[in-house]
Every structure is written in C-alpha cells, then in structure tokens.
Amino acid sequence: MPLLDSFTVDHTRMEAPAVRVAKTMNTPHGDAITVFDLRFCVPNKEVMPERGIHTLEHLFAGFMRNHLNGNGVEIIDISPMGCRTGFYMSLIGTPDEQRVADAWKAAMEDVLKVQDQNQIPELNVYQCGTYQMHSLQEAQGIARNILERDVRINSNEELALPKEKLQELHI
C-alpha cells in the first residue's frame, strides 16, 4: 500500500494550532491544488469533541470561504480528520501559510458570533447525516481555544520522519 503524505511527518513533534502545507499538485490543465493540514489539537494529546467538531464542520467551511476565497484562491473542500485533531482543506491556488492562518483566525471569530444553534447551516434531517449530533457550545469552545493559543506554522522539513525511522516502522 502506498504511504500517504500525512504519515511521513512526525506527529510527536507537531505543534497546534498550526497550518501546514500537506500536499501540492497540478491538474492536467496546470491549475495548482494545495492541501492544508489545519491542526487544531496536538496529536495524541488532545482531541476535539465529536459534537463540537461536527458543528464546526458546518460553520468553518463557509466562514473560511468568506475570508480566503479570491485573489487566485478557491476552496474546494474542508473536512475533519478522522483522528479529530484537525481539518484538511483542499483548494485551488497556492496561498501562503500566513494568509491561511489569518483566515482561520477570522473564521474562529465568526464562530464565536453565532448566537443560536438554529443558525448552524444545513442543520436538518435532509442535509446532514447526523443532524442531532451538534453542539454550538463545544464548537465555540474549540474556536476560543484556537484564538487564545494563536495559529503557528508547521514546517514539513522540520517534521519529516527520517527514512531510517520509516524503515524501522516497516513502512
């Protein structure tokens, strides 16, 4: 099985909250696609609560588009990681990490402005697979945590697992 890019970085040295370019590629037509690791929690030490991350998924995608789309950037998708320590964001374009970090912080400010659970987009049986599994309070707690700790940049070069370690892990 091919080794995914996300498993070539040392999760024990990852900082959070932090932005990292997880992957860059070009389409056959030459469009640049960038995938960002938006790490909300320190791996293996913190985890986002399931209701909070689900609510954040509904809010975050729209708020990030408001703050990041434009000037050669268009978000394709923002999805939570299965480990519940962050989100992956795929987009057209190549914004630098600081631009992404600034948009992320602005989106977290927007999450704090949501006053009622009824303002969560697509919160209904028709548009959400588990529409009863939400918590605005938990999502706002996550947002506050990000803003209090600020957003840093994780460098692939600093986090790269040495080839010897990958061999030792039988990868």
UniProtKB/Swiss-Prot annotation:
UniProt cross-references to InterPro entries, sorted A to Z: LuxS_sf (IPR037005), Metalloenz_LuxS/M16 (IPR011249), S-ribosylhomocysteinase (IPR003815)
Cofactor-binding details, from the entry: Binds 1 Fe cation per subunit.
Cofactor annotation: Fe cation
GO MF entry, a single one: S-ribosylhomocysteine lyase activity
Enzyme nomenclature, EC number: 4.4.1.21
Broad class of enzyme this protein falls into: lyase
Positions of transmembrane segments: none
UniProt-listed Pfam families: LuxS
Reaction it catalyzes: S-(5-deoxy-D-ribos-5-yl)-L-homocysteine = (S)-4,5-dihydroxypentane-2,3-dione + L-homocysteine
Residues binding Fe cation: H54, H58, C128
UniProt-listed GO biological process terms: quorum sensing
SUPFAM superfamilies: LuxS/MPP-like metallohydrolase (SSF63411)
Family affiliation: Belongs to the LuxS family.
Purpose of the protein: Involved in the synthesis of autoinducer 2 (AI-2) which is secreted by bacteria and is used to communicate both the cell density and the metabolic potential of the environment. The regulation of gene expression in response to changes in cell density is called quorum sensing. Catalyzes the transformation of S-ribosylhomocysteine (RHC) to homocysteine (HC) and 4,5-dihydroxy-2,3-pentadione (DPD).
Record-linked HAMAP family: LuxS
Subunit-level organization: Homodimer.
Protein name in UniProt: S-ribosylhomocysteine lyase
Source organism of the structure: Escherichia coli O7:K1 (strain IAI39 / ExPEC)
Name of the gene: luxS
